[in-house]
């Protein structure tokens, strides 16, 4: 498996990935990642999602450490820039606990609630988790319990891979976006030439009207995946391709990047996920805009739409309803009484000599 995975990524010198990307390549389950040290990370809400997902077996969970000094890593019992599997998620005696495994099958957590921690563990907690602390002390198999608060502090990345069968409706759209395409290199002021789509979602009515709308809404997930086309050429350029998706609540092509309804931060991760919900009983149309931070390289990508409700995805045409082209030129005065049509800026008295056109909208 490792050889096959490395081959499709161009060899063992590929730029690297994370456990969420790897699990998507191996299983096809939808990747979602969080930086637990980010100020926008919602610790409580994420815990609830972890508990619910683990209860039904619809999510693979992994965590990863970041860079850290060797002394700190030894003190914590962790491996820097290393991925760990999450085996269990539970709350015991009011403490949020996570069962983690080092895939090396040795080297484990030395902090709070480690096997050597005799102060934090209580008889009630050990009983609730069916944890034999004495046996754990005698054998280091890389498996350990850690409280959720310590996990969020000691680890950097949290990666969730969701079962795509959770969604009844799905479609994929593949596209090539050349770097020399029309439009500015930086789309901060104009996204009119970016690839765009209209997405119409028909959310069914709530089965139980007494439930709040948030519990009856239809989930819609958009996954933008960048293709690896030329492995050698992309080994240096890939980190510079920062992509995102912008979602607007309208039915037409966007030209100016106003504040979107939903969006994701620009990232050089090959997968970008945007999630939102459609209220029950409503049919809403959205415009989806694919964006690059700096359009320097050709981009081949896939846009996947996963939805609990029926939907229709249509690529937006760049062709406008009416188009007229007029040829003209700026010319300088060449004598003989001819007036220059290059009148300059509005600060010049000759400004009115610039070419002018009248536009009448019917």
Summary of predicted features, one role per range:
Residues 1-362:
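Accessory/interaction modules and long regulatory regions
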